[in-house]
């Protein structure tokens, strides 16, 4: 059985109480047909999540699902959090949350769109942030030792003076975000979203041998938005690359044809 974690928008309940963005869980036996089975539990004590939480990355270590996600709705103060679960549904928050936000003059201090992968006996945390003017979205990376508990003190920001990837190609416009990373034969491949949502957002690929220095594989998008009238006319974005233990790789992505009114 496979579990998928994905963002769901906020809503106002029948009592008029507003609920922020959250994370839902779906299950599948074939990676194609999915059934929603619930939502990641909110934690009233986690006041840093009071406006919502979203953009999950799930990492299985032993018999535990580790969830890395972002706070939502706090602008420059949004940061990466960590929680864990043994059933995949009910999660315990890390007491040191938020576990990461970047320093350095090149960014605004924000961190979203977490992606965590173990590589060369370290854990690499990829994140998106913006420039101090809050216009350009870029990618950074932090590392933690192999024996980490994923606490705040374990993460060392490697992007102290510059991003590891920033928009440079015409189709990337003002944004690179939503990185998802896979290892093949000792090489890392990053699938990333170029341009902001519905600009249109499309998917590119970069590669690295050390997890820090990256080079694009293609000048054009690896996965484009759809033709006019198709379901993903407005974008093909926020990718996730999944290495199935049976040997196949699956690329998940979001799309819409309503300029972001739904996904």
Positions of the model-derived regions?
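Beta-rich carbohydrate-recognition and catalytic domains
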Residues: 1-51, 59-109, 117-174, 182-234, ...
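Short tryptophan-centered beta-strand motifs in secreted/extracellular beta-sheet-rich domains
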Residues: 114
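Active-site/pore-lining binding-face segments in mid-to-C-terminal subdomains
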Residues: 178
